[in-house]
A protein has these predicted regions:
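Hydrophobic core of transmembrane alpha-helices in multi-pass small-molecule transporters
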Residues: 28, 96, 111-133
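Interfacial helix-capping/hinge residues at the ends of transmembrane alpha-helices
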Residues: 42-43, 138, 151
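Loop-to-transmembrane helix entry/capping segments in MFS-fold secondary transporters
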Residues: 53-54, 145-153
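Membrane-interface helix caps of multi-pass small-molecule transporters
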Residues: 75-80, 152
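MFS-fold secondary transporters
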Residues: 99-103, 107, 126
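Intracellular juxtamembrane helix-capping segments at the cytosolic ends
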Residues: 130-145
């Protein structure tokens, strides 16, 4: 109990380390991109392309299913470093988001079924990279945020 109180008091007095404020912007932008890629807009777009209920279920299930790739990736994350794993994973992930941005622009070039197939491939790749890179997320954040201010952060 005394340790908890000491941490609580230290959390109210300790300033954030230099650079940690930038994480708030990262979290905000990450939240926005995830809302677009893994929430209502992608489902509405897939439905407009003629996606069946099965395809919609596949899209909904990709995110939790691809987290399974954390298991084999965990063996390599310590060797390459948490920051490298996260920054590389998030950068590659953004390439697939960029690909998704261009799919609606191909309306006259590709038929709706091909656009839907392209959306599925890009979402699969996005979620697989996200699943692999996310195994380094908590260790990296734990290393960035000192223990005495974690509750405040």
């Amino acid at each position: 109990m005394a340790h908890f109180l000491a941490l609580s008091q230290a959390a109210t007095k300790s300033p954030f380390p230099k650079g940690v404020q930038s994480l708030f912007w990262f979290f905000f932008l990450n939240f926005l991109s995830c809302q677009i890629i893994m929430d209502s807009p992608i489902f509405l777009y897939a439905e407009s392309l003629g996606a069946s209920a099965t395809i919609m279920g596949l899209i909904a299930g990709m995110t939790p299913l691809m987290v399974i790739f954390q298991i084999p990736a965990a063996a390599h994350v310590g060797r390459w470093g948490y920051k490298f794993f996260i920054s590389t994973g998030w950068t590659v992930r953004l390439l697939f988001v960029l690909g998704l941005v261009f799919v609606p622009l191909m309306d006259g070039v590709l038929n709706p079924q091909s656009q839907l197939a392209l959306v599925l491939v890009l979402l699969f790749a996005f979620n697989m990279v996200r699943g692999i890179a996310s195994c380094a997320w908590f260790p990296w954040i734990r290393g960035l945020i000192p223990e005495n201010i974690r509750g405040r952060y």
